[in-house]
Amino acid sequence: YDRTNNIYSLSLAEKELQEDDTLLIESDLIFDDTLFPMIVDNPYPNLALVAKYETWMDGTMVRLDEDNNIVNFIPKKAFRYEDVDLYYKTVNIYKFSKEFLRTQYVPFLNAYTKALGNNEYYEQVLRVITLLDHCELKALPLAGQKWYEIDDVQDLDIAETIFAPEEDRLPLYQKRYGGYWRFPNLLDFCYLVNPYFPNTRLKEELKANFDNLLTEY
């Protein structure tokens, strides 16, 4: 357990992966039930559900072309804040066809683990496949459907608020005594802010002097 990662867990199911079409779902997710028919009923055989990047998201990102083909997987160590407008977060729900698994994913999975070991992520195999000239993996962006990845107690608390019945949600927000920034889609009309300050020029000046401001004051 302390020497492997999810690429090893998936490799244990190598035989079963090649027997039929597969839905791959990570176990730390909570999500709207509509995501299942959304991906299953889509006619494209190899899909990854993705969501436009928001500040709470962590882990593997992807970049898409105009046809929603995945052109690159961006691992956590290659994340660049200056590119966040181009990023989509993998929801970690995938649909793979038997043919794709048999002819591409499993062979690359075996080669990857032999070369780099078992302490890796299965998304890295997908990253290699996207470098091929004829990659068959597309993205299916969400359109506001709820989902959350739960890694700790704080994530669980946020997810319980997001998925609470509408009539219970406001009291749960208010129990937090702030921290609304963790909910990017929440508009807080009681928060005392000046929508005209800072202006764009001042923000650019602060960015330009950020290193000095951070380290010398």
Language-model features, listed with the residues they occupy:
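N-terminal "arm"/small-domain region of PLP-dependent enzymes with the aminotransferase-like
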Residues: 164-216
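Conserved alpha/beta core of the MobA/IspD/sugar-nucleotide pyrophosphorylase nucleotidyltransferase superfamily
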Residues: 87-175, 181-183
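Short beta-strand-to-loop acidic/aromatic patch adjacent to the donor-nucleotide binding site
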Residues: 20-30
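Short, acidic Gly/Pro/Ser/Thr-rich loop/turn segments
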Residues: 56, 80, 101-103, 147, ...
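Short, well-ordered beta-strand micro-motif
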Residues: 63, 95-97, 149, 188, ...
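Conserved N-terminal catalytic core of the sugar/cofactor nucleotidyltransferase
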Residues: 1-20
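Conserved core of the sugar-phosphate nucleotidyltransferase
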Residues: 32-116
